[in-house]
Amino acid sequence: MNIFNNNLHETDKEINEIIKHEKLRQSSVIELIASENFVSPAVLEAQGALLTNKYAEGYPSKRFYNGCEEVDKAENLAIERVKKLFNCKYANVQPHSGSQANQAVYLALLQPGDTVLGMSLDSGGHLTHGAAPNMSGKWFNAVSYSVNKETYLIDYDEIERLADLHKPKLLIAGFSAYPRNIDFAKFREIVDKVGAYFMADIAHIAGLVATGEHQSPIPYAHAVTSTTHKTLRGPRGGLILSNDEAIGHKINSALFPGLQGGPLMHIIAAKAVAFLENLQPEYKSYIQQVISNAKALASSLQERGYDILTGGTDNHIVLVDLRKDGITGKLAANSLDRAGITCNKNAIPFDETSPFITSGIRLGTPACTTRGFKEKDFVLVGHMVADILDGLKNNEDNSALEQKVLNEVTKLIELFPFYG
């Protein structure tokens, strides 16, 4: 058998069919999962390139394998482009994920048992910020800060009080479900008072930071981590940024050989492509549209009587609090899914329900904005979501309404382009 003549359709019909069906699913639903997006065909092409064949342990010009001349060029391009994008002095583009980017920073700056202070899961934080089931909660003495119980906004006074009390080695700013801006300068003030390191995890808002639509943490944080998908609209992966090159040197050693082995050179090439796209003027317009669309979505749901956490949004995330409506997040997300609208159940701050059930849903605008949705389209989407939620108030069997909304979704989504 000549492997170089094989294609997927002939080699593995089952996987080929799965990919075809997934393409159909992605093309036919309104995608509101806040952490998802659609990459360009150029990113897909780079990600599927033969660079996947190349082992390249180490860093450009310091590899443990020969034959790395071309992949060195690709990685250097990715590094230089992302440094320009975020206006920083140091970048590492090798992390396989945002979680591993965070782990590399921990490995570089902390010792087991050190205290870390991060946002609690139910307030919108991430597993890797000290949650008990995660490595960060097992290896370190994790302390959590919450949001204000009335406004649901970050409580900087509480963070300062906890920092004074616990003297963390690392203070973490960042979230996976928080719809408002973060004051990174205020975090740095707190850090300087207690002599801690400051890490900003901007996985969700990296695109906003890169385009100036959110305050940059680069001047304030010792290390900045992110994913390369979500609002950056690149391949799935991670990155680490800093203006402190001495810390950057520690992070390089922590990531390789400390945490990872060979980098994924096809993914790094795809990251470089995405960063080039992010440097174009139209990307800033895209991010501005993402934010405007989120505000339109939040307003349309508020008009229908639904509680939007914090009263609105500054970014791409809309959190719907369903406690007063007597609907669980799980029930709502499943019903919306059957109606062709994909989102996720999400905990609400101080949520007393199980994280597998939750009292809210998280909605996001990056993916549909990539397809061309504008504010008026998200107003329609908001009403579709509200229709489904209204139906659930009366009856958990929402099948008739789900079919009606699915028909509306189909008519709307057909107006917007997808991969050919």
From Swiss-Prot:
Belongs to the SHMT family. It is an enzyme of class 2 (transferase). One of its GO terms (cellular component) is cytosol. This is Serine hydroxymethyltransferase. Homodimer. It is found in: Cytoplasm. CDD domains: SHMT (cd00378). It comes from the Bacteria. Its EC number is 2.1.2.1. Its main location: cytoplasm. Pathway: One-carbon metabolism; tetrahydrofolate interconversion; Amino-acid biosynthesis; glycine biosynthesis; glycine from L-serine: step 1/1. Its cofactor is pyridoxal 5'-phosphate. The modification N6-(pyridoxal phosphate)lysine is found at K230. It comes from Rickettsia africae (strain ESF-5). The gene is glyA. It catalyses: (6R)-5,10-methylene-5,6,7,8-tetrahydrofolate + glycine + H2O = (6S)-5,6,7,8-tetrahydrofolate + L-serine. The record marks H229 as: Plays an important role in substrate specificity. (6S)-5,6,7,8-tetrahydrofolate binds at L121, G125, H126, L127, S354, P355, F356. GO terms for molecular function: glycine hydroxymethyltransferase activity; pyridoxal phosphate binding. One of its GO terms (biological process) is glycine biosynthetic process from serine.
